[in-house]
Design a protein with these regions (language model features):
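Phosphate-binding glycine-rich loops and their immediate beta-loop-alpha structural context
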Residues: 36, 44-57
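Residues at the starts of beta-strands that form the adenosine-phosphate
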Residues: 13, 32, 54-61, 83, ...
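MIDAS-like acidic motif and immediate structural context at the N-terminus
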Residues: 31-41
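FAD-binding FR-type
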Residues: 1-33
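Short, structured patches in soluble enzyme cores that scaffold and shape functional sites
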Residues: 18-19, 37-38, 61-65, 88, ...
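Reductase modules of NAD(P)H-dependent flavoproteins
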Residues: 67-221
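Short glycine/serine/threonine-rich phosphate/pyrophosphate-binding segments
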Residues: 42-48, 124-127
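Short, glycine/serine-rich, charged loops/turns that create anion-binding
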Residues: 21, 40, 66-67, 123
Length: 221
């Protein structure tokens, strides 16, 4: 679906959009809050950081990416946060390492952190939760498991939180990181990996075929 969206041209549009889904993100005056965005998760954590700042919090941001060219929304996050840290896996920009490394340093610095929001790849969110748990810091993660209808009917987005089954589309997307069964979530998200790869190959071949027809001046339907 992401690949299909990227093929849309000017004046083309999505017929219908359903939303917002789930439960609103908890926004209140907590005190000192750390907002962490990993990869494209930065796009989701940015409005949260902005809202938390407007609610009167001291907001510390951490943005992580594999390399400098993949860092996004740096200026926007900088404007929304009192302090912003950048980390890259390869050290090409900011601190070399992971967002969890920076998070642990902030915790160990002695300045009290009241709440953490971590959004990004599942392994990243799992590690951030593991970092904050020994210190008893409330940590929210935003889960985006396999989702079909978005109303809780299909059960595709079910996750185990605190030993109970939840649906990310209606009960989430934010959950307590210390209660999420991340191992189960990772396993479920791999269910359709092979089918997704096959589908992507077919789609790319189809797009390539259409492009060749256009270049040849054929009518494309």
């Amino acid at each position: 679906t992401t690949k299909l969206l990227s093929t849309l041209k000017e004046d083309e549009y999505i017929l219908d959009v359903v939303g917002p889904l789930g439960i609103p993100t908890p926004i209140e005056k907590f005190g000192r809050v750390v907002c962490i965005g990993g990869g494209v998760g930065t796009a989701e954590v940015y409005p949260i950081a902005k809202a938390l700042k407007e609610a009167g919090n001291e907001v510390i941001g951490i943005v992580g990416a594999r390399s400098k060219d993949l860092v996004i929304l740096e200026n926007e996050m900088s404007a929304a946060c009192d302090k912003l840290y950048i980390t890259t896996d390869d050290g090409s920009y900011g601190r070399k390492g992971f967002v969890s490394d920076q998070l642990l340093d902030l915790i160990k610095s002695g300045n009290k952190i009241d709440v953490v929001y971590a959004i990004g790849p599942i392994p990243m969110m799992k590690v951030c939760g593991s970092v904050t748990k020994p210190f008893g810091i409330k940590t929210y993660v935003s889960l985006n498991p396999i989702m079909v209808d978005g109303t809780g009917m299909c059960g595709g987005c079910r996750v185990t939180v605190g030993g109970k089954m939840k649906f990310a589309c209606v009960d989430g997307p934010e959950f307590d990181a210390h209660q999420v069964d991340f191992d189960e979530l990772i396993m479920r998200n791999r269910t359709y990996v092979d089918l997704e790869k096959t589908s992507l190959r077919k789609l790319e071949a189809h797009i390539c075929n259409l492009s060749e027809k256009k270049l040849a001046g054929e009518v494309v339907k």
